[in-house]
Every structure is written in structure tokens, then in C-alpha cells.
Amino acid sequence: MIRMAFAVACGGVIGTLLRFALATWVSAQWPRHFYLATVAVNLLGCLLIGYLYATFLARPDISPELRGALIIGFLGALTTFSSFSLDALRLLESGQLATAFAYVGGSVLGGLLAAWAGLALARL
């Protein structure tokens, strides 16, 4: 358990630093489009989680610690959108279309509503 926690923490540090670097660079390139930095890290995270998922399926010998460092730590720090996308992809791949669409729609709408609620609470 300690080894896994350390691996996840190490991956998280790297993911955090990459997110900071990418967001800083993208924001400097397109300062009027604040959302592009988030889109960039989310899309990168989705690309990477798809790649890693396929790699881990093909290579079951990859250690749980490395898997945890990359998926939970690195991509978790880079973006949680990648995990959301993988969950939706797995639902689609398993033929659970209604659940996948409910998950995607509910997550997006729920996220927007939660962000709005947080904004409203902060303004009280």
C-alpha cells in the first residue's frame, strides 16, 4: 500500500507540473480564450488515458504501481476529465448505451450545476 501511495504521489507531482506548464503556455498564446488551457489539458489527458488503457490491456505484466502512478497520479493531477472519458468509453464498449449517455449528460449537467452552486454559495 505504501509503494502504491508513493507511486501515485510521484505521478501526481509530474501531472501537476505538466498541467501548470501547459496551462501557462496556452494562456499566454491565447489570453482572451481562458478556456483553451482547460480544453488542452483535458484533451491531452483523454488521449493519454486511451493510449494507456490499450497498453495495459495488451501488457498485463505492467506493475500495479506503474499503472497507479500513470492513471491515478499523473492523469488524475493533469485532469479528471480523462477518467470520466474512460468510464464513458467503457460503458459504450460494453453496450450500455443508455447508461453511457446518462452518465455523460448527468456528469456535464451536474458539473455545471455544482459549479454554479459553488459560485452562488461563495457570493452569499
Curated annotation (Swiss-Prot):
Pfam families: CRCB. InterPro entries: FluC. It is a multi-pass membrane protein. The chain crosses the membrane at residues 6-26, 34-54, 69-89, 101-121. GO terms for molecular function: fluoride channel activity; metal ion binding. Keywords: Cell inner membrane, Cell membrane, Ion channel, Ion transport, Membrane, Metal-binding, Sodium, Transmembrane, Transmembrane helix, Transport. This is Fluoride-specific ion channel FluC. The lineage of its organism: Bacteria, Pseudomonadati, Pseudomonadota, Gammaproteobacteria, Pseudomonadales.
